[in-house]
Amino acid sequence: MPISAAALPVAVIGVGFLGRPLACALPAPVLALSRSGTWPEGPVPEAIQLHALDLVHADRGALTRVLAPARSLVICVAAGRTQDRRAVYIDGLTRLLDACADLPLTRVVYTSSTSALPDHNGWLDDDCPDPPDGERGQIQHEAENLLRTTCEARGTPWVILRLAGLYGPGRELFRLYRADPDAIQP
């Protein structure tokens, strides 16, 4: 059942660990894209229209058709344990942004990670000229720059959220620290 553009303002790209709770919290209806097209917790909620689209392999036309009703994007993609990070975060984001080139988007929100910042013992802000230390951070930083420059060139408002402590299902931070009780300081 198609949903009109007026009734579907937000598309959540990536409805896994972060995107799924967000999609459920947004006012109905919500357009949701996932690599698998499945909803792990039983049936897809009635307010959510779920589409299976893998950003790494989807063609521009398919992405544009699915996203055409959206007026805002929230990008919550994550590389799986066996996926190539560059393919997901750079190639997939490029494909997504290309597909949205002619859409009248009012805002793009990108969920990133604090790994996009360098490892410093001190205060950091967005003006820090130093690159991130590891490959993961460098790819995240590159993806942020891609989003920023593309949105600015199109005049689309954008927000990058750098989240910390993202470990995904079954890898909660507490469980990681449990092995070393001294790692958690009051």
Predicted segment positions?
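Conserved N-terminal Rossmann-fold NAD(P)-binding element of oxidoreductases
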Residues: 10-14
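Conserved beta-loop-beta element that borders a ligand/cofactor-binding pocket
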Residues: 145-169
